[in-house]
């Protein structure tokens, strides 16, 4: 499979509604991906004169560039992490900032990227930015058992993290873990029968943990939440879509802390989730949560 498989953006209507009374002029999308949200925002808001879209995934940026050709005079795309976006951004630049966290359908469907446990013979890569950093395979073959266990526990919240880490280290003594199938084989005896009978694949949490570690998603999210409030103009809004509690919790806490400090107010007192219709059409949207914060109109 290739990167041409389309990604279905989630909570698009709900995201647009959070900015409809603002008519943003300068907007930042720090996870532009294949350009789904960007296309919707640029269509909905003719007021947007500059749309800065960034992503760590070069293949996604190529798709986004093609998709956003009708808006090319209003779009500026950048290959950048959240940290790199921060170094490029002056305080008080944006009317709105959007972040759509996690892995995209496009990345999951491209089995060559190693994000999905369906790609038996494909390499365990899992890097958003394939130009830098350790692959998931390198992590599993080089780190100590205790370190691998901590990854499974801290980033996957996998109950059987000790057993899974021990199984990985035992397997790699005989054969390097290079492919998805190798990881499946390494952990084949870890999960009890009731986990195997569930709809959710038993390796889901292990794959989540490896992806988060490989891409340093926790550290990147911290950079975003420490920086994005500064990027906003007075009255500007930060909207964040998350797909797991490890992402949603820090967003919720950061918004609460910012509100307590008088930096602005939380607009989503009740977190926004996909409608039944959206989850039916796009099952991968079922865990999505959208939160939004509005910066105060007065400088603090």
UniProtKB/Swiss-Prot annotation:
It comes from the Bacteria. It catalyses: cytidine(1402) in 16S rRNA + S-adenosyl-L-methionine = N(4)-methylcytidine(1402) in 16S rRNA + S-adenosyl-L-homocysteine + H(+). S-adenosyl-L-methionine binds at residues 35-37, 55, 82, 100, 107. Gene3D superfamilies: Putative methyltransferase TM0872, insert domain (1.10.150.170), Vaccinia Virus protein VP39 (3.40.50.150). GO terms for molecular function: rRNA (cytosine-N4-)-methyltransferase activity. It is found in: Cytoplasm. InterPro entries: RsmH, SAM-dep_MeTrfase_MraW_recog, SAM-dependent_MTases_sf. Pfam families: Methyltransf_5. Its EC number is 2.1.1.199. Keywords: Cytoplasm, Methyltransferase, rRNA processing, S-adenosyl-L-methionine, Transferase. NCBIfam families: 16S rRNA (cytosine(1402)-N(4))-methyltransferase RsmH (TIGR00006). Specifically methylates the N4 position of cytidine in position 1402 (C1402) of 16S rRNA. This is Ribosomal RNA small subunit methyltransferase H. It comes from Chlamydia trachomatis serovar D (strain ATCC VR-885 / DSM 19411 / UW-3/Cx). The gene is rsmH.
């Amino acid at each position: 499979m290739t990167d041409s498989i389309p990604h279905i953006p989630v909570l698009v209507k709900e995201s647009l509604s959070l900015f409809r009374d603002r008519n943003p002029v300068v907007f930042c999308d720090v996870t532009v991906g294949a350009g789904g949200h960007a296309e919707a925002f640029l269509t909905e808001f003719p007021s947007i004169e500059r749309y800065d879209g960034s992503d760590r995934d070069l293949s996604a940026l190529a798709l986004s560039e093609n998709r956003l050709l009708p808006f090319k005079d209003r779009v500026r795309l950048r290959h950048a992490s959240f940290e790199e976006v921060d170094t490029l951004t002056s305080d008080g630049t944006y009317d709105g900032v959007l972040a759509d966290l996690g892995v995209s359908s496009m990345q999951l469907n491209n089995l060559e990227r190693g994000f999905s446990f369906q790609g038996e013979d494909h390499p365990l890569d899992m890097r958003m930015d394939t130009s830098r950093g350790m692959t998931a395979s390198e992590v599993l073959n080089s780190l100590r058992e205790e370190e691998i266990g901590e990854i499974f526990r801290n980033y996957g919240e996998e109950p059987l993290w000790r057993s899974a880490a021990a199984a990985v280290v035992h397997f790699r003594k005989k054969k390097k873990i290079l492919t998805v199938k190798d990881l499946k084989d390494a952990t084949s005896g870890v999960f009890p029968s009731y986990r195997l009978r569930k709809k959710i694949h038993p390796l889901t949490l292990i794959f989540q943990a490896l992806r988060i570690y490989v891409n340093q998603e926790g550290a990147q999210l911290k950079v975003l939440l420490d920086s994005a409030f500064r990027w906003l103009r007075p009255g500007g809004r930060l909207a964040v879509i998350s797909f797991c509690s490890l992402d949603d919790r820090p967003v919720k806490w950061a918004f609460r802390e910012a509100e307590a400090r008088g930096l602005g107010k939380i607009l989503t007192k009740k977190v926004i989730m996909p409608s039944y219709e959206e989850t039916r059409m796009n099952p991968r949207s079922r865990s999505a949560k959208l939160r939004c914060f509005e910066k105060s109109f007065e400088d603090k």
